[in-house]
Amino acid sequence: MADVSIEKLASDIGTTVDRLVGQFKDAGISKSAGEQVNEDEKQKLLDHLSKQHGSAAEPTRMTLKRKTTSTLSVGKSKEVKVEVRKKRTYVKRSDIEEQQRQAEEEAKRLEEEARLKREAEEKAAAEAKKAAEEKARKAQEAKKAAEEERVRRAEQAKKEAEARKKDEPELTEAEKAEAEAARQEEERLRKAQEEEAQKKLEEDAKKAADEARKLAEENERRWKEEEERRKKAEAEEVHLHSNRYAQEAEDEEDMQVERSSRRRRKSKKNAGEHLKQGFNKPAAPVERVVKLGATITVGELASKLAIKSNEVIKTMMKMGEMATINQVLDQDTAVLVIEEMGHKYELVNDNALEDELLADGTDGEKTSRAPVVTIMGHVDHGKTSLLDYIRRAKVADGEAGGITQHIGAYKVQTDNGEITFLDTPGHAAFTAMRARGATATDIVILVVAADDGVMPQTKEAVQHARAAGVPLIVAVNKMDKETADPDRVKTELSQLEVISEEWGGEHQFCNVSAKTGMGVDELLEAIVLQSELLDLQAVAEGPGRGIVIESRLDKGRGPVASVLVQEGQLRAGDILLCGEEYGRVRAMRDENGKDMKLAGPSTPVEVLGLSGVPVAGEDAAVVKDERKAREVAAKRHQKKRELKLARQQKAKLENMFANMESGDVSELNIVLKADVQGSVEAISESLIKLSTSEVKVNIVGSGVGGITETDATLAAASGAIVLGFNVRADATARRVLEAEEIDLRYYSVIYNLIDEVKAAMSGMLAPEFKQEIIGLAEVRDVFKSPKLGAIAGCMVTEGNVKRSNPIRVLRDNVVIYEGELESLRRFKDDVQDVRNGMECGIGVKNYNDVKVGDQIEVFEIVEVKREI
């Protein structure tokens, strides 16, 4: 071929000119764009690229597949084709030898490195040992030289003393004593110096000997490790190159030798013990003691009884209870099953860990504490203004700008003592406390505007206070207005059974004005008087206990909980357990935002450091063990989850019977709202009259107007259903009702409302079932079907015959079989039912002994509910 240009060659092979020029350069050929390329240069480039990419190397492994086909005669005229496939892999011998050679060289290299390393370590150890010996020898020589120097100095001093004694005249007694004392002092100092030098030499020698010993021990340990590693590698190498079956045989032989040597070591005295039967037949039935908590599954019960689960299920079926292996049994059912199976039980407390953790109670001397007061009322009745006046007059005296309340709670100092106020907007925390049976609130102040009278939310506040069982003090506000009418307020509240002391009741009424401050001191005195009547006391020492007023998630500080301490003391650094959350108190702040180190009873504080945001209304307690606190919090979370799953259908009208059975609902709680007061009174009276000895209707709350968030929280706290008569729920209330899964029903006719509540109460009673005959057919002939067996040709004499209904086969008016109608045909068509006077073919499921003259009775099971 003729020479081609660089551009043409690059275009033919599909690459760029620059890359091709670079490849020529790598091959040792200098080319540039525009030059020509001859055949020799092409061949050189091709050889270079082949070597570079490895294509010039010879194959090291080759696999050949062969297939041969032959014919095998089977019998006289039958032949079978046999195909034999063979696969052979050939490996280049030089490669194997090269690999073995490389492995041997690598092993030699590693062995040489190990030898050199070992020699270096031995040499270092020898040098260290020699250095230590040399150091010890020098120390010994120094010691000997010091001893000789000491002896020489002593001799010299003795000679000098004798010379001085000869030359000097006779000394007096005082001079002799002074000279003797000087000599003794000099001798003492010399001995001290010699002892110090001797001690230093001994320490240096001992230190050198210790270093040499440690180095020798370290080298000896490393040599042993190297030797063990080398032996292990040699053993592994032997096994790697040995046959697998030979290795297994060798291991088996070693095990047999070990077993035989073990048998030889055993004494003949104990040989007879192994020949005895290991199982002894029980002389009496095994009686087990099962520890029972509140609930237990069938599988867990079987495991504790050491029997199979189907045995427990059989026993329950004999007792008339159907169950599965994962079904949860309550404590009473489990007790009956255990007693039926002949075992014993022991009731245990599921909250043992929690009780143990909280056992360190505040046992001590009780002292009086400040009352906890909650102020409730309509937002337009001056509640906020009254709070602001109390805070400005009693808390922020002398402080510019007043005080910003951080935690919804604060203390007021009066002449008669302290008062703790709780600000619970929306009454959410108050309702949660009442639902948990808490006693955080001691007194409720009801604020009512003198010019506006009792409003619907005022009635709701009265219902909340009455449900919580706390005393009520009425503050009639806005008395500075000309239209103020306190007598009207007393009259309207008397309809709610809130009677003033002036009218012979038990509730205190105070006329106040948040604008002018009139009556505020009298209100505070009334609170103090009421608290003295209640005789409020608490233990001031010991671990603190309280309740969570409110909680939130602060962006900069994390979970923040407002806690009202009820007993004991809460300190910074304590481990606090609040419901499902726990943590160490990192910081505490009071209502002014100032840091606190200690909080006593009736003191509200803001706590930082919890693991999460606790629920408002949860109990808070100081514990000692953080690990146990974490376990209790996790267990509470699990228990809450199980309870939530168990009460998915709680407060549903259709499931009242199930709730009654489980003991969750002992009465039908209702929150009733209507458009006018007359309807509320009429419906309440009618519903209460429906109560019987078995089922009781309890009107938890009632009022006029739309269904609000307060009604929803009240229903959630008391497990009630919400009934609305010509009213509707607002968006906030609907969100709460959906979140708590509370049943909400609207009515416009009073009779429909009463009938449905009556039906719900009837649903609490056990239903009855009865069988109702719907058709009768007489067998006229019997046919055989290959698919269905015996088919009865029948004439329907009474009622209708329906497909897939339960049936009975009667012979001489005696029931001989009870089953299900499987096939129903008229002529050749499948039909769903056949009326009276028509012929049909009936196939009875799993029964073929049908005879002419039999009667087939078709029936259905009807549930008959008990009604009140």
UniProtKB/Swiss-Prot annotation:
GO terms for molecular function: GTP binding; GTPase activity; guanosine tetraphosphate binding; translation initiation factor activity. Residues 377-384 are annotated as: G1. Keywords: Cytoplasm, GTP-binding, Initiation factor, Nucleotide-binding, Protein biosynthesis. Residues 49-72, 92-276 are annotated as: Disordered. InterPro entries: DNA-bd_dom_put_sf (IPR009061), EF-G-like_DII (IPR053905), EFTu-like_2 (IPR004161), IF2_assoc_dom_bac (IPR013575), IF2_II (IPR044145), IF2_N (IPR006847), P-loop_NTPase (IPR027417), Small_GTP-bd (IPR005225). Signal peptide: none annotated. Residues 92-240 have a biased composition (Basic and acidic residues). Residues 402-406 are annotated as: G2. Residues 477-480 are annotated as: G4. GO terms for cellular component: cytosol. It is found in: Cytoplasm. GTP binds at residues 377-384, 423-427, 477-480. Residues 513-515 are annotated as: G5. Residues 368-537 form the tr-type G domain. Residues 423-426 are annotated as: G3. Belongs to the TRAFAC class translation factor GTPase superfamily. Classic translation factor GTPase family. IF-2 subfamily. One of the essential components for the initiation of protein synthesis. Protects formylmethionyl-tRNA from spontaneous hydrolysis and promotes its binding to the 30S ribosomal subunits. Also involved in the hydrolysis of GTP during the formation of the 70S ribosomal complex. This is Translation initiation factor IF-2. The gene is infB.
